[in-house]
From Swiss-Prot:
GO CC term (a single one): cytoplasm
Record protein name field: Adenine phosphoribosyltransferase
CDD domains, sorted: PRTases_typeI
Biological-process GO terms, alphabetical: adenine salvage; AMP salvage; purine ribonucleoside salvage
EC assignment: 2.4.2.7
The encoding gene: apt
Upper taxonomic lineage: Bacteria, Pseudomonadati, Pseudomonadota, Gammaproteobacteria, Enterobacterales
Reactions catalysed according to its record: AMP + diphosphate = 5-phospho-alpha-D-ribose 1-diphosphate + adenine
PANTHER family: ADENINE PHOSPHORIBOSYLTRANSFERASE, PHOSPHORIBOSYLTRANSFERASE DOMAIN-CONTAINING PROTEIN
Sorted UniProt keywords: Cytoplasm, Glycosyltransferase, Purine salvage, Transferase
UniProt cross-references to InterPro entries, sorted A to Z: Ade_phspho_trans, Adenine_PRTase, PRibTrfase_dom, PRTase-like
A GO molecular-function descriptor: adenine binding
């Protein structure tokens, strides 16, 4: 292992160790991965932004899209580091200009996301960023919005992946390359 690879492995371990696990939240049997504990640690937060930015520095990305709300906390600094624009995807009624919307299925019901119609241009190469990848439903809806506006989504980045919930496989089937800093077993 090179010095650089060793340092990266240490940073990834530090990031993972900074994420607290809350058992039985929000309901019994769930192990909740609390990314806010990473945000409280400036060294871990900075390392996560640095590693994501370095990973995509040569990707040709022209926009970074972050999903409400924690995707904003990671997506905006990554966009800034890459020197590209940041685009928020939000719940209905939160964006002031003209929007399009996409509904998606949840475990019990549906939810909807919106994006400004002028925020993505045809041909934009888009990186979608969120804090956590579970089933992939939120990201799938976000990708549909971007593609409807003519953007090309080939990358999605996450701090945490929960592989057992199938989100990465779901997105990979749609041609989206997923990159996560850390993975946790369980859900």
């Amino acid at each position: 292992m090179t010095v650089s690879a060793s340092k990266t492995a240490q940073q990834l371990k530090y990031i993972k160790d900074s994420i607290k696990t809350i058992p039985d939240y929000p309901k019994a049997g769930i192990l909740f991965r609390d990314v806010t504990s990473l945000l409280e640690n400036p060294k871990a937060y900075s390392a996560s932004i640095k590693l994501l930015s370095e990973h995509y520095s040569e990707s040709g990305v022209t926009k970074v899209v972050g999903t409400e709300a924690r995707g904003f906390l990671f997506g905006a600094p990554v966009a800034l580091a890459l020197g590209v624009g940041f685009v928020p995807v939000r719940k209905p009624g939160k964006l002031p200009r003209e929007t399009i919307s996409e509904s998606y299925e949840l475990e019990y019901g549906t939810d909807t996301l919106e994006i400004h119609t002028d925020s993505i241009q045809p041909g934009d190469k888009v990186l979608v960023v969120d804090d956590l990848l579970a089933t992939g439903g939120t990201i799938e809806a976000t990708v549909k919005l971007i593609r409807r506006l003519g953007g090309e989504v080939v990358h999605a980045a996450f701090i945490i992946n929960l592989p057992e919930l199938g989100g990465e496989a779901r997105l990979t089937q749609q041609g989206i390359h997923c990159y996560s800093l850390v993975s946790f077993d369980g859900h």
